[in-house]
């Protein structure tokens, strides 16, 4: 049977007080709407359509790699109107459509599959996701028939005294028979205080026609939506707890999960230890046996086996096996650090390759460089890669020794097995096996201080 999803993502979200469309605010390093799209894809649905409106182009851009289609709701006239805007997507399809909102990112793959399975097996024309909560104040109530099918949805303000006692609430997430949904959409009206078309009215229309309507209950946290910054924080905490628990179940140790921030798409292999204050983002991969000491940020990077990182930033780069980074190192995008390398304190690497077994222990800048294996950089070395207009490349051969406070003025090549004396400024090629000294010869003028009368 054909199965598809419709994600309602057209609202601006006034309570967010933001120029960014609400569904593009991030939860655990991913836009809320992309959380929902990814869940739909994992649920093996054939097609996903997103209804966009406010900030439509921004939403398109953020979701452009997701292989989805779009429907435009140019004017926000309610949830029923949003679904009507997707009629072209639904028309001609024979099957079911699951409808979710782009601001409720906690829905799970299991729930989507269970919803559709329950809908099919029960022979329902519509199925509602519900939740049971102790304090249902403000939520629409699910009123069931004796046989367990849904009789109606009653908004809180319209509930009778008995209906107010019901603790089962509507989530605004549904599964519909597509043909029945389209027929009911044609019968919707906006005869209400808000002048809007409500998707909940479709349930009433189907019930009046004698259609069978079901409901499946899920944990309340799954249906949590975001309408404010406070709710964004609340949803983020639930999502982060899920993510961190998943990694711990897979064999990683998180010393303090409440203070460890791991993005939704981060991969961590077993036997890695993560201390508090770490922030792992993007498509980062942490291989087995790593130790991440407190307060590092790693984004879109691959960290090899048995790497130790201390209080450092690594962006869009690769770090090889058995390497140590930090404390207070900065590895900038497009850097490739080899195996058994030492990147020490206050070292900055930018768009450079560092060969295996090389040591860059402290207070060094390496930019736009290709560094060989087994090299040693003395404290205070600077690769001078920028001439005020263009960036230039530096090549340093294997087993080169760069003395303290050396300036390598790019473009320049230092060949294999070379030594550069401390304090040198290198502007020309250094041949293999050479010692380069590029500094003024020391001159000592004895008695000069007395002659100048500088002693007091």
From Swiss-Prot:
Coiled coil: none annotated. Residues 1-229 are annotated as: Pyrophosphorylase. In the N-terminal section; belongs to the N-acetylglucosamine-1-phosphate uridyltransferase family. It is an enzyme of class 2 (transferase). It catalyses: alpha-D-glucosamine 1-phosphate + acetyl-CoA = N-acetyl-alpha-D-glucosamine 1-phosphate + CoA + H(+); N-acetyl-alpha-D-glucosamine 1-phosphate + UTP + H(+) = UDP-N-acetyl-alpha-D-glucosamine + diphosphate. Its cofactor is Mg(2+). NCBIfam families: glmU, PRK14354.1. Homotrimer. Its EC number is 2.7.7.23, 2.3.1.157. Binds 1 Mg(2+) ion per subunit. One of its GO terms (biological process) is cell wall organization. Acetyl-CoA binds at residues 385-386, 422, 439. Transmembrane segments: none annotated. Residues 230-250 are annotated as: Linker. The gene is glmU. Pathway: Nucleotide-sugar biosynthesis; UDP-N-acetyl-alpha-D-glucosamine biosynthesis; N-acetyl-alpha-D-glucosamine 1-phosphate from alpha-D-glucosamine 6-phosphate (route II): step 2/2; Nucleotide-sugar biosynthesis; UDP-N-acetyl-alpha-D-glucosamine biosynthesis; UDP-N-acetyl-alpha-D-glucosamine from N-acetyl-alpha-D-glucosamine 1-phosphate: step 1/1; Bacterial outer membrane biogenesis; LPS lipid A biosynthesis. It comes from Clostridium acetobutylicum (strain ATCC 824 / DSM 792 / JCM 1419 / IAM 19013 / LMG 5710 / NBRC 13948 / NRRL B-527 / VKM B-1787 / 2291 / W). One of its GO terms (cellular component) is membrane. Keywords: Acyltransferase, Cell shape, Cell wall biogenesis/degradation, Cytoplasm, Magnesium, Metal-binding, Multifunctional enzyme, Nucleotidyltransferase, Peptidoglycan synthesis, Repeat, Transferase. This is Bifunctional protein GlmU. Residues 251-456 are annotated as: N-acetyltransferase. It holds the Pfam family Hexapep. The active site is at residue 362. Mg(2+) binds at residues 103, 227.
